[in-house]
Structure formats: structure tokens, C-alpha cells
A protein has these predicted regions:
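Core catalytic region of metal-dependent phosphoesterases/phosphodiesterases
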Residues: 13-16, 23, 27-130, 193-198
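Conserved beta-sheet core of the metallophosphoesterase superfamily
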Residues: 175-247
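Conserved catalytic scaffold of divalent metal-dependent phosphoesterases
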Residues: 97-192, 222, 239
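Accessory, non-catalytic peripheral segments of nucleic-acid enzymes
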Residues: 2-13, 53, 240-263
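Active-site flanking residues adjacent to catalytic metal/cofactor-binding acidic residues
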Residues: 20-21, 57-59, 97-98, 165, ...
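Short amphipathic alpha-helices and their capping/turn segments at secondary-structure boundaries
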Residues: 2-12, 36-50, 149-159
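Active-site environment of divalent metal-dependent phosphoester hydrolases
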Residues: 24-28, 62-65, 95-107, 129-130, ...
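Beta-strand-turn-beta hairpins that frame and shape the catalytic cleft
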Residues: 8-18, 128-138, 158-162, 214-216, ...
Length: 263
């Protein structure tokens, strides 16, 4: 069976993308987190013959940290290495704001990279990003914004090629079974909200990878640090032809810490 690296090498889709989320630097030993990401994510995407977009779909951090903490140091090292890969491959890096208690306004640590050697988009409000002819709706996790705020992007701005977000999809989290854009907390999305999306919706927030209603995908988190997450961990590779609207998503597993829940 041909590997995804070889599939990228021998085919020529319009876009080749890597999606990762819920990194949560500082949830466990950040040195070990960095080692896993360096060896199994950064080194992997560096081998791809083509790379157009890398998207971090929320929650780089686990909570607010002191600037001199190991979590901040390793997170900055990770982003710096990722930017160097993107610069060499002429890839766009999208960094999406995640849960407020996790990213905690710390994406400012990366503002100084914007306008540098690589094309970097740090997204902290809902907006469209235009990347090499591809239109992407990007939705960070926001609170109490109201239905009209989201509807102007979802329904009143025309068609778009794909959507990347950090957030909640109906049925993906216990107790979140009803779609709701007017929530006092974060909205709960459903496929009906993405009727103008011509491609996949790829999200962070839920730590187990999965697909809902055929076109909504969660990356899952890249490693384990607690019980109850025995499912495979990893990241997504997206091959997306925006002309034919065909796409292929490959889940690339990451070897991680093992936790066994015994009932």
C-alpha cells in the first residue's frame, strides 16, 4: 500500500496541508511533548514533497504560563522550527486561537513572526483567509458573540473552499447535542451551518480524532497525558483539489504515552 508521503509525491493535488490541534504545551513535561512533535510531526511534514498549508487548529498552550517557563520556551521552539519548514516550502502557517482558558491570549508571543520569512496568519476572530487562490473560513473559539455575528460569515459571504476552526460540533461532546449559534458560551455547530462550504471542515477541541456527518473532522490531540483517551493520537494530512472539490484526508498516527483505563 502506498504511503501518504508517496501519494503526495506522485500526485499533484491543488493543495497539500497538515492539520494539528490541541498540543497543550505544559499539560505534561513540555520537553517530552516537544520531542514527540519534533520527531513525529515536524520531521514528517518536512519530508513531504509539497506542502501548501499548515494549520494549528487551537490550543497550543494548556493554560497561562510565565514567560520564563519551560512550556513557553518549548512552544516557541516548536513554532520557530515549524516556521522555518513553512518558509523553505513556501507554505502558509495558520494559527487559530483555541479555548480561552488554554491559549489564554498567549498567541501574542508569535506576533513578531508575522510579516517575516514565512506567510503566517494568526487568527483570533472569525475571518476569511485567502491562500494561493483558496478561500478558507477560519473560526477561533469565541464566546457570546451572537447568531448574527456568525451568520454573516456562514450564510452571507458566498461560497468558500474549506473551514478550519476550534470549536464544538453537535454530538461530539457530552451534553452538546443541539446546534446553537446564540450560546452565551461557545457556539455548537452543525453541518447545516456550513452549507456554503465546498470542502472539508477541520477542527480542534475534541482530543479524539473523528469524523461527523461525512465532512466535519477533528484532528484529535497529538499525544496522551491523562486517562480516558486510549484512542489513537496524531494529526491530519489533507489533499484538496479546489477545482473538482474532491479531497482526501489521511490520519497519521503518533506514538504517545500509554494510559489504560480499567473499569
Amino acid at each position: 500500500m502506498i504511503s501518504v508521503v508517496e501519494r503526495v509525491k506522485y500526485t499533484n493535488p491543488v493543495f497539500v496541508e497538515a492539520h494539528i490541534s490541541d498540543i497543550h504545551f505544559g499539560a505534561t513535561d513540555p520537553a517530552k511533548q516537544f520531542k514527540i512533535l519534533k520527531e513525529q510531526f515536524l520531521d514528517y511534514i518536512d519530508k513531504l514533497q509539497v506542502l501548501d498549508i499548515v494549520s494549528i487548529n487551537g490550543d497550543i498552550f494548556d493554560h497561562k504560563f510565565m514567560a520564563n517557563s519551560d512550556a513557553v520556551m518549548y512552544a516557541c521552539n516548536f513554532i520557530e522550527l515549524l516556521i522555518s519548514i513553512c518558509a523553505r516550502k513556501n507554505a502558509t502557517l495558520i494559527i487559530i486561537a483555541g479555548t480561552a482558558l488554554h491559549d489564554a491570549d498567549q498567541l501574542k508571543l508569535f506576533y513578531h513572526y508575522v510579516g517575516g520569512a514565512a506567510d503566517i496568519r494568526i487568527v483570533e476572530r472569525v475571518q476569511f483567509e485567502y491562500i494561493k487562490g483558496k478561500t478558507v473560513l477560519v473560526i477561533p473559539e469565541l464566546y457570546n458573540m451572537g447568531r448574527e455575528y456568525y451568520e454573516q460569515f456562514l450564510y452571507n459571504s458566498g461560497y468558500y473552499d474549506s473551514c478550519y476552526l476550534h470549536g464544538t460540533y453537535k454530538g461530539a461532546i457530552f451534553g452538546k447535542d443541539t446546534p446553537e449559534l446564540d450560546s452565551a458560551r461557545e457556539p455548537v455547530f452543525a453541518m447545516s451551518h456550513f452549507i456554503h462550504c465546498k470542502g472539508p471542515i477541520i477542527a480542534g477541541h475534541v482530543h479524539t480524532p473523528g469524523c461527523f456527518d461525512k465532512h466535519f473532522y477533528y484532528c484529535g490531540s497529538p499525544y496522551r497525558w491523562k486517562f480516558g483517551e486510549e484512542e489513537e493520537k496524531g494529526f491530519l494530512i489533507l489533499l484538496h483539489n479546489i477545482e473538482t472539490m474532491q479531497y482526501y484526508i489521511h490520519f497519521e498516527p503518533i506514538k504517545s504515552f500509554r494510559y489504560d483505563t480499567i473499569n
